[in-house]
């Protein structure tokens, strides 16, 4: 039987991604009003254990995956960078083979995407990318779920990304051809998306429009998306903020988007840097629904990976 890893969006078929989102919507509706610790009907992952490895600190990823396993009737074990580091002391491949003997699936939040790929190649259980320097596929599934939940039809929609063409942007680029939306990306030249990701989208016949101003990218967009300008470990933070400041999402920028446009941000947010408080705390913002939907999207991802 083929092992179902969830490392990136682009290798999956559109039908598989659609099925994951449909199940996420259905599971969320099925437990509306329930206590958060109540197990889903049928306990789909009863007896299953997820190992969670964190090389990077986390709030939403850690809590959402742990609660996902609890609600599905399973359990989780967490190891941080203080407990272990991939490739140090023991090879990534050996770690993957050992953990495969103990647990049913592994979620990794890592510094280097290549480590996650090497881990998955050696593992005999499903491996999920919880975030790497290259991509953040679980986040994008939650984002798309949130947009659908608020009435947006993805096919034919125009989404705009402004700021740093980072790992989250990369996963939106991968998702565009799979779900049929176009993506306008507004970044400074030095923070433009990786050419490899643009080539992936081109091969999948996705529409990705690149701009050097936020205003051009946002014009007429149904959704405006931002992310932090400075992440953990970034050097020369002051210079980054200076270069990216013209890409901050303000009320004035949102006025250039389509009527009723929504705002997304995967959090944590820095009000006054990449987004103004009036936007992220205003009526267009879906950020807390987006954060909650990490739980529901990841439950569906776990069930898809484990064939449950």
UniProtKB/Swiss-Prot annotation:
Q: Which one Pfam family would you cite for this protein?
A: OTCace_N
**Where on this chain does carbamoyl phosphate bind?**
58-61, 85, 109, 136-139, 266-267, 294
Give the catalytic activity.
Answer: carbamoyl phosphate + L-ornithine = L-citrulline + phosphate + H(+)
* GO cellular component, as recorded: cytoplasm
Main localization of the protein described in the UniProt heading:
cytoplasm
- Location in or out of the cell: Cytoplasm
Looking up PROSITE patterns in the UniProt record yields:
CARBAMOYLTRANSFERASE (PS00097)
For this UniProt record, give its keywords in alphabetical order, as a comma-separated list.
Amino-acid biosynthesis, Arginine biosynthesis, Cytoplasm, Transferase
InterPro entries noted in UniProt? Asp/Orn_carbamoyltranf_P-bd, Asp/Orn_carbamoylTrfase, Asp/Orn_carbamoylTrfase_sf, Asp_carbamoyltransf_Asp/Orn-bd, Orn/put_carbamltrans, OTCase_ArgI
Q: Where L-ornithine is bound, by residue?
A: 167, 227, 231-232
Q: Which PANTHER family match?
A: ORNITHINE CARBAMOYLTRANSFERASE, MITOCHONDRIAL, ORNITHINE TRANSCARBAMYLASE, MITOCHONDRIAL
Describe the family membership recorded for this protein in Swiss-Prot or TrEMBL: Belongs to the aspartate/ornithine carbamoyltransferase superfamily. OTCase family.
What biological function has been recorded for the protein in this entry? Reversibly catalyzes the transfer of the carbamoyl group from carbamoyl phosphate (CP) to the N(epsilon) atom of ornithine (ORN) to produce L-citrulline.
Q: What is this protein called?
A: Ornithine carbamoyltransferase
């Amino acid at each position: 039987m083929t092992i179902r890893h969830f490392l990136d969006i682009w290798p999956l078929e559109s039908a598989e991604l659609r099925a994951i989102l449909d199940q996420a919507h259905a599971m969320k509706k099925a437990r509306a009003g329930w206590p958060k610790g109540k197990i889903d009907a049928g306990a789909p992952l009863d007896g299953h254990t997820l190992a969670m490895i964190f090389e990077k600190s986390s709030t939403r990823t850690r809590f959402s995956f742990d609660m996902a396993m609890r609600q599905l009737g399973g359990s989780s074990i967490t190891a941080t960078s203080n407990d272990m580091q991939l490739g140090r002391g023991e090879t990534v491949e050996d770690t993957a083979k050992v953990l495969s003997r103990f647990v049913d699936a592994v979620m990794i939040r890592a510094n280097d995407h290549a480590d996650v790929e090497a881990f998955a190649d050696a593992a005999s259980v499903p491996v999920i990318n919880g975030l790497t320097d290259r991509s953040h596929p679980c986040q994008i599934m939650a984002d798309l779920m949130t947009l659908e939940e608020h009435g947006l039809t993805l096919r034919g929609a125009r989404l705009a990304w402004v700021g740093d063409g980072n790992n989250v942007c990369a996963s939106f680029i991968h998702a565009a051809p799979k779900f049929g939306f176009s993506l306008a990306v507004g970044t400074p030249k030095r923070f433009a998306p990786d050419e490899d990701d643009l080539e992936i989208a081109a091969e999948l016949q996705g529409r990705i429009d690149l701009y050097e101003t936020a205003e051009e990218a946002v014009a007429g967009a149904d959704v405006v998306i931002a992310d932090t300008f400075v992440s953990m470990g970034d050097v020369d933070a002051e210079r980054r903020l200076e270069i990216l400041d013209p890409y901050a999402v303000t009320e004035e920028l949102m006025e250039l988007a389509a009527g009723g446009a929504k705002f997304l941000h995967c959090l944590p947010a820095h009000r006054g840097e990449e987004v103004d408080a009036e936007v992220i705390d205003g009526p267009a913002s879906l950020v807390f629904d987006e954060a909650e939907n990490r739980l529901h999207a990841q439950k569906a991802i776990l069930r898809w990976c484990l064939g449950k």
